[in-house]
Curated annotation (Swiss-Prot):
EC number: 4.1.1.39
Organismal lineage: Eukaryota, Viridiplantae, Streptophyta, Embryophyta, Tracheophyta
One of the record's GO cellular component terms: chloroplast
Changes after translation: The disulfide bond which can form in the large chain dimeric partners within the hexadecamer appears to be associated with oxidative stress and protein turnover.
Organism: Dioscorea elephantipes (Elephant's foot yam)
Gene Ontology MF annotations: magnesium ion binding; monooxygenase activity; ribulose-bisphosphate carboxylase activity
Propeptide intervals in chain numbering: 1-2
Designated name of the protein: Ribulose bisphosphate carboxylase large chain
Record-listed Mg(2+) binding positions: K201, D203, E204
Modified residues (N-acetylproline): P3
Biological processes, Gene Ontology terms: photorespiration; reductive pentose-phosphate cycle
Binding of substrate, residues: N123, T173, K177, R295, H327, S379
Known catalytic reactions: 2 (2R)-3-phosphoglycerate + 2 H(+) = D-ribulose 1,5-bisphosphate + CO2 + H2O; D-ribulose 1,5-bisphosphate + O2 = 2-phosphoglycolate + (2R)-3-phosphoglycerate + 2 H(+)
Annotated active site: K175, H294
């Protein structure tokens, strides 16, 4: 390079490292309707000011890098950079802050959850200047959400397909989750559906193992569905898990499910990946299949309070990527989930417009502009004594899944299904008559036991079962 060239290249450019806050901390910034807004829980290293930590998050998740580069002059950083526009201390925590960051819409590819997360929760989470970092919430602008298809069908279309209204849907995960032959698996599916359940379900790790290949399972489950439908006069379904090692194999399994006339397939959206999930959701809408989503691996990402990503963000991402059901905790069962926090992201899944409400962990007002809703699924350690609470907490637009709470019945699978259906119908009737499920729940169940021996037997088995542990992830109050 000639001396003349060196001189020209250096005009207006000063090499070196400068504080992030000089460029990316902009407390006077007024957010735009088109910005993606993020709330990060930031735990800086000792000696790192909160403004510098928040600015570093904004920089490293958008246009910034660790040093000044001369190619900054070839673009408009002011147009494309992320901006930390507000910082607040976390109640009850020392040296921990909520940093609010605004991202210009042009930073993200349309219709791609994969690209959105690659930027916002990418390398910045390994940044040395931070002891820990957690994404608490996102505000998705309507101009971005409209680039997504969303759920294949949504709540109302699903109810119309199933012809079931005015109550939660009932499901059951077939147990043991691994080890059954396809024929015995299909038998369990039939018994549960025949007993009164709406759905049965593959467990998340049932794919295509040596003891039960996927095609055999699909065939026996389809036979079980048709037999149960013929005997009950109700539409039934089984969540056929299409999750596979490649997108091509996943779609092949979904195609076979459709050819069998199955109403619904299933996907593990975190282990399978957002690209695969969106592809499957598009196929399901085009071909009339409902899509059940399991959140296997979510607790690796969302359970720790100081680092990772809250499930409300994963729930929003799923609604954009596509799914008609998603597991959302139970509040009362064996899995993590504080009541107000759970109800917050349940609303984010189902409702069209959700107001900011920090008492439920909702940092931003979210407008889904008529994107179809997702049914929350309560599953994990629940049984008939939980039915009043589940009906009261989740309401009609939900799926209540009793795996062990069905197949663990002392009389067998079908009586277990009968017990759950009777308990649900009793709770719905009592609620419709104006009774208080929270206060009178146990009495309602005992009354139903008088005319349902199956329910009475279930109540006796599970009368002492409780999961009383404090949740790890709690609201900042």
């Amino acid at each position: 390079m000639s001396p003349q060239t060196e001189t020209k290249a250096s005009v207006g450019f000063k090499a070196g490292v400068k504080d992030y806050k000089l460029t990316y901390y902009t407390p006077d910034y007024e957010t735009k309707d088109t910005d993606i807004l993020a709330a990060f829980r930031v735990s800086p290293q000792p000696g790192v000011p909160p403004e510098e930590a928040g600015a570093a998050v904004a920089a490293e998740s958008s246009t910034g890098t660790w040093t000044t580069v001369w190619t900054d002059g070839l673009t408009s950083l002011d147009r494309y950079k992320g901006r930390c526009y507000h910082i607040e201390s976390v109640v009850g925590e020392e040296n921990q802050y909520i940093a609010y960051v605004a991202y210009p819409l042009d930073l993200f590819e349309e219709g791609s959850v994969t690209n959105m997360f690659t930027s916002i929760v990418g390398n910045v989470f390994g940044f040395k200047a931070l002891r820990a970092l957690r994404l608490e919430d996102l505000r998705i602008p309507t101009s971005y959400s409209k680039t997504f298809q969303g759920p294949p069908h949504g709540i109302q279309v699903e109810r119309d397909k199933l012809n079931k209204y005015g109550r939660p849907l009932l499901g059951c995960t077939i147990k043991p989750k691994l080890g059954l032959s396809a024929k015995n698996y299909g038998r369990a599916v039939y018994e549960c559906l025949r007993g009164g359940l709406d759905f049965t379900k593959d467990d998340e790790n049932v794919n295509s193992q040596p003891f039960m290949r996927w095609r055999d399972r699909f065939l026996f489950c389809a036979e079980a569905i048709y037999k149960a439908q013929a005997e009950t006069g109700e539409i039934k379904g089984h969540y056929l898990n299409a999750t596979a090692g490649t997108c091509e194999e996943m779609i092949k399994r979904a195609v076979f499910a459709r050819e069998l006339g199955a109403p619904i397939v299933m996907h593990d959206y975190l282990t399978g990946g957002f690209t695969a999930n969106t592809s499957l959701a598009h196929y399901c809408r085009d071909n009339g299949l409902l899509l059940h989503i399991h959140r296997a691996m979510h607790a690796v990402i969302d359970r720790q309070k100081n680092h990772g990503m809250h499930f409300r963000v994963l729930a929003k991402a799923l609604r954009m990527s596509g799914g008609d059901h998603i597991h959302a905790g139970t509040v009362v069962g064996k899995l993590e989930g504080e009541r107000e926090m759970t109800l917050g992201f349940v609303d984010l899944l189902r409702d069209d417009f959700i107001e900011k409400d920090r008492s439920r962990g909702i940092f931003f007002t979210q407008d889904w502009v008529s994107m179809p809703g997702v049914l929350p699924v309560a599953s994990g350690g629940i049984h008939v004594w939980h039915m009043p609470a589940l009906t009261e907490i989740f309401g009609d637009d939900s799926v209540l899944q009793f795996g062990g709470g069905t197949l663990g019945h002392p009389w067998g699978n079908a009586p277990g299904a009968v017990a759950n259906r009777v308990a649900l119908e009793a709770c719905v009737q009592a609620r419709n008559e104006g009774r208080d499920l929270a206060r009178e729940g146990n009495e309602i169940i005992r009354e139903a036991c008088k005319w349902s021996p199956e329910l009475a037997a279930a109540c006796e088995v599970w009368k002492e079962i409780k999961f009383e542990f404090k949740p790890v992830d709690t609201l900042d109050l």
